[in-house]
Amino acid sequence: MDIDGRTFIVTGAGSGLGRATAVELAGAGARVLCLDVDVAGGEGTAGAIGGNADFVRADVTSESEVAAAVEQGGKALAGAVNCAGIGIAERTVGRDGPHALDSFARVIQINLVGTFNVIRLVAAALAKRAPGADGERGVIVNTASIAAFDGQVGQAAYSASKGGVAALTLPIARDLARHGIRCMTIAPGLFDTPMLAGLPEPAREALAADVPFPARLGNPAEYASLVRTIIENRMLNGEVIRLDGALRMRPK
């Protein structure tokens, strides 16, 4: 799919992978709707991009707020990139007792249910569009994590949510094939995003040293570059791509 002149929704656009993706797509000529609950971050991204971007304050778990964003995308809407998500560190049984059910449910609600909410509403709008080359109507890119496969201590909730995102990729791609809509997922490894920003520098260096090559944290721009490749290559469909420098997390 040609990106130039199309409109894309990017969730979690206020920082990290979402911000880099919004910048990448706008640079390729797209209009970007920057969705986030972080008003300052979302407005900052849209402002940095300029005329090709608009900030939309939207909670991915809200049907009405996402539906309004989809409506704002108009007839040029060509897809979405799901980057919104949260992470927690909580053991199944810790010093204070069992994992809090509320915190587990919150991670699932935002990371998995929120992603699906965006997928279904965007896909419903795209299905009404006139098809382009090869009958394509749009593309949706999701964000999982290598934690979906190599989850660490304290990552039960996060791994479950990202494992769900990885698992829904193929069935949704099959569901939407008749409409000419592709569904892909990227599973990033260790990236230099706000989720890791709070760690002490020695801890960040230790994490980077675990990556076989390149032995560093990923740059969000590298994630965004893969998003662009996925959008532009119609044969990429129904797959989860690990973007991790060959990292396989050891139990810790």
Feature roles, as predicted:
Residues 87-105, 124, 128-134, 154-157, ...:
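Conserved mid-core segment of classical short-chain dehydrogenase/reductases
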Residues 177, 182, 236-239:
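Short, small/polar-rich loop/turn modules that mediate ligand/substrate recognition or access, typified
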Residues 2-33:
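Canonical Rossmann dinucleotide-binding motif of NAD(H)/NADP(H)-dependent dehydrogenases/reductases
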